[in-house]
Design a protein with these regions (language model features):
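Structured soluble/peripheral alpha/beta segments that form catalytic or ligand/cofactor-binding pockets
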Residues: 1-298
Length: 298
């Protein structure tokens, strides 16, 4: 989720991955258990205005994870508890080493949801909703309620090909008024485009599907990923989403350090200023975050 500007945080991202994904950072050498299929990867980032905290660690599905088949219920010791039933979910997260406690209650909005499907390879389903967060971090505590996203889906393990995606870029922008602009751009090796799509969700009721996303990088920097490999990371870029109804164009600048919890790629926050050319036209500015995977991002 991307927080409102008056909040003490920029964004929060919590990922739960079951099984090895097969990209270059996610190999048996990094898994110390017996069976790689037993891997449970927990990724977390809470980016504050002045500081942040992250977590990335493999756990064992068999020995550490409590879950119930055919229902939404996951428990990883005292660190994570995720449960609920459509349309409401409850998440409890604890990071004792950072003196952090979070309690999150997510209520799904009615109506439209965003679905991205690559046959036999990938499925990504986004639910939109409101999330009430009660937090305690060191000596500070508080409660925030804000629009949020719940992404869930599956991806086929492509490990036999030994080739990671050339690009996986997932952007989430908070729009004026609490809506979202989201985009997903994926490329296979050889710059073969797999899926490129987007969406403007103005509020709980209005939305505009977008057909294509473009990214023109204006300035690069280099950072080491989770595997210690040097990767190019955009510092400034121009993003563009197109549709028959109009064009959303914005210039963005990264405002946080790239967090390497995603292994082959990074998670980072940015500010942006943009323009929607459709009817009615409007200027849009705010904050967002990126999930970027792929060493060969061009």
């Amino acid at each position: 989720m991307v927080f409102p500007p008056e909040a003490p945080f920029r964004f929060l991202n919590l990922n739960v991955l079951l099984g090895m994904t097969g990209v270059s950072f996610d190999q048996i050498d990094n898994w110390h258990g017996v069976d790689p299929k037993d891997a449970f990867d927990l990724q977390f980032c809470l980016e504050g205005r002045n500081c942040g905290t992250t977590y990335k660690q493999y756990h064992s599905v068999k020995s550490e994870l409590d879950y119930q088949p055919n229902v939404v219920q996951l428990r990883l010791g005292e660190r994570l508890n995720f449960e609920g039933r459509w349309p409401a979910y409850q998440i409890r997260y604890s990071q004792p080493e950072a003196n952090l406690q979070l309690s999150m209650d997510f209520d799904t909005w009615d109506g439209f949801h965003w679905w991205v499907y690559i046959p036999k390879i990938y499925c990504h389903y986004t639910s939109f909703g409101s999330c009430r967060i009660k937090w305690q971090w060191n000596d500070d505590e508080g409660t925030i309620e804000s629009p949020a996203l719940h992404d869930h889906g599956w991806g086929r393990n492509l490990l036999p090909f030994r080739l990671p995606l050339n690009v996986f870029r997932y952007e989430v922008l908070r729009l004026t008024g609490g809506g979202f602009a989201i985009s997903l751009w994926t490329e296979a090796p050889g710059r073969l485009e797999l899926k490129n799509t987007g969406l403007l969700r103005w509020d709980a009721h209005q939305y505009q599907p977008m057909e294509h996303y473009e990214c023109q990088v204006l300035e690069w920097e280099y950072f080491a990923n989770y595997a210690g490999q040097k990767c190019r990371v955009p510092r400034r870029w121009i993003g563009k989403q197109n549709s028959n109804a109009g064009e959303f164009t914005y210039e963005a600048e990264r405002r946080t350090d790239p967090r390497s919890i995603m292994g082959d790629g990074f998670l980072y926050g940015f500010d942006y200023q943009g323009q929607w050319s459709g009817s009615p036209g409007r200027k849009i500015e705010g904050e967002g975050y990126v999930e970027q995977l792929g060493r060969y991002f061009h």
